[in-house]
Design a protein with these regions (language model features):
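Conserved Lys-Pro-Asp/Glu-containing loop-to-beta segment of HAD-superfamily phosphomonoesterases
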Residues: 133-150
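Cytosolic catalytic headpieces and adjacent flexible linkers of membrane translocases
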Residues: 1-4, 8-136, 154, 158-214
């Protein structure tokens, strides 16, 4: 006999009103998460980031093909990864992009910019993809504030104009953030050394072990 258990992580009482105030004051609110698309869309609907029918832009089952599908898995349109995006869909739906689809579109800068400019939810994205989304938003002229509550958000927090870290204050989280910042500083120093050696026609210095093993 099969058994099921349902667990719900309730929203904070002021979450909906806070997001509503941001949306009503000419701010654009976007969700970027590692959760799956259906979970992300459900939460985004609760906080009114998604107001229309949601459409998921995802990688198909074969090769590099992409699909535009509803939450019930019905296909709205197929998308040739090398063809222009179906722009009319942005006018009809609130779009959720998966990390798998983002990996395909990353190779096409103009399509990526158009997609990021019209997407309200990102699901199943990696830490590097979170950082990429923030980078593209800034290139589109947005002043970006990123709020994140885990070490997976550190890169995106640093990429944003304003990064708000929502931590539980545990020593482990703080140590990870400090270590990430230290590695970033070492990386910049090493890149400066590479540039200097190249300018003087000298061989590159060895990669510091701490960077090589990172």
């Amino acid at each position: 006999r099969q058994r099921q258990m349902c667990i719900r992580d309730r929203l904070k009482p002021d979450a909906v009103e806070s997001l509503r105030q941001l949306n009503n004051s000419a701010h654009r609110c976007v969700m970027i998460t590692g959760d799956n698309a259906l979970t992300a869309i459900h939460i985004a609907e609760e906080v009114e980031i998604v107001a229309r029918e949601a459409l998921i832009f995802d990688k198909g089952a074969v090769g590099e093909e992409l699909v535009w599908r509803r939450t019930d898995d019905s296909i709205v349109r197929m998308q040739d990864p090398d063809a222009p995006l179906h722009r009319h869909l942005f006018d009809e739906y609130d779009v959720c992009v998966t990390g798998a689809a983002l990996r395909v579109i990353e190779e096409r800068p103009e399509a990526l910019r158009e997609l990021v400019g019209n997407t309200v939810v990102y699901a199943r994205v990696s830490p590097n993809q979170k950082e990429l989304v923030l980078s593209v938003l800034r290139s589109l002229g947005y002043i970006a504030l990123m709020a994140g509550d885990g070490t997976n958000d550190v890169g995106a927090l640093k990429m944003a104009n304003i990064g708000v870290a929502l931590l539980d204050g545990s020593e482990e989280d703080l140590q990870r953030i400090q270590e990430h910042a230290r590695l970033e500083r070492l990386k910049k120093v090493y890149e400066s050394q590479l540039s200097l050696m190249s300018r003087w026609g000298q061989p590159p210095p060895p990669v510091p072990p701490v960077l090589r093993d990172a």
